[in-house]
Amino acid sequence: MSLEYLPPVRRRIGQYNHLRIYKKILLLKSNFEKLNFFLGNLFPEELHDSKIHVYFEVRLGCRIPDCIIVFRHFGEKLLKTFHCYFFEFKTTFAKSNLFSIQKNRTQKIQYLQGLRQLRQATDYLQQFVIKNESLCKVNPVICFFRQHGLKLDFVKTFIAKELQLSSTFLCNLFTKYQNDTVKSILSISNPTNFRRACQKYSNLYRGRYATTPKLGNSKTSKRKRRNSKKQDFKKLVKN
């Protein structure tokens, strides 16, 4: 099942809104309550004091999850459990819910594609399992946001996988393979410049600030037209 039937501009708008979601997550990263609320209150309270690492569009084999959030526990000693959330974000023009996802063709395809992306991305981590390492709880999550106002309409969390993984290795892996262009865009602090960069990256940039090339000197064009009329008149007189 594919969304190829959608006009290209619809897909570009979706990409643009993904960048807006990423930026919002970064802005809320330091506030556990607000970040948790924005993403549907899916983080347990026990993660409140954990160190948060956020990565966007990390290439894991043939899959690129939209966002990965890692919670690492630090205290007098490193606890033997850490949490890793894999997110797939879907944006819609209309409101989405469980019923609309079942009945609406586009939303249903978005949901199924998200499931496949999450399953294959989390399966990719299996190759890095190390015996007697920390226990990593890998939580796949799919979120449907409304494009207007980035309102979260629907969120679904799936059964977590428990894998023995090195948190340090995993964070280094995600850092290495995340999208550097997206990371650069998200580092822009000025709202206007950030919006323009998002539009340009998504091919929605209208070139509002670009200079329009001149077609030619208007005086020269007028002179050519006058000379042409004179030549036509002379031909008529001769005939």
From Swiss-Prot:
Q: What upregulates or represses it? A: Expressed late in the infection cycle.
Record key words, sorted: Host cytoplasm, Host Golgi apparatus, Host nucleus, Late protein, Virion
The record's listing under Pfam families reads: Herpes_UL24
For this record, the Gene Ontology CC terms, alphabetical, are: host cell Golgi apparatus; host cell nucleolus; virion component
Q: Where found in the cell?
A: Virion; Host cytoplasm; Host nucleus, Host nucleolus; Host Golgi apparatus
The UniProt regions of compositional bias labelled Basic and acidic residues, in chain numbering, are 229-239
Say if the entry is tagged with keyword Transmembrane helix: no
Q: Main role?
A: May participate in nuclear egress of viral particles. Plays a role in the dispersal of several host nucleolar proteins including NCL/nucleolin and NPM1. Since deletion of host NCL/nucleolin negatively impact on nuclear egress, UL24 supposedly acts on this process through its effect on host nucleoli.
Q: What is the protein's major site of localization? A: virion
**Similarity section:** Belongs to the herpesviridae UL24 family.
Query: What protein am I looking at?
Result: Protein UL24 homolog
Q: Which InterPro entries match?
A: Herpes_UL24 (IPR002580)
Origin species = Human herpesvirus 7 (strain JI) (HHV-7)
Segments of this protein annotated with the region Disordered: 212-239
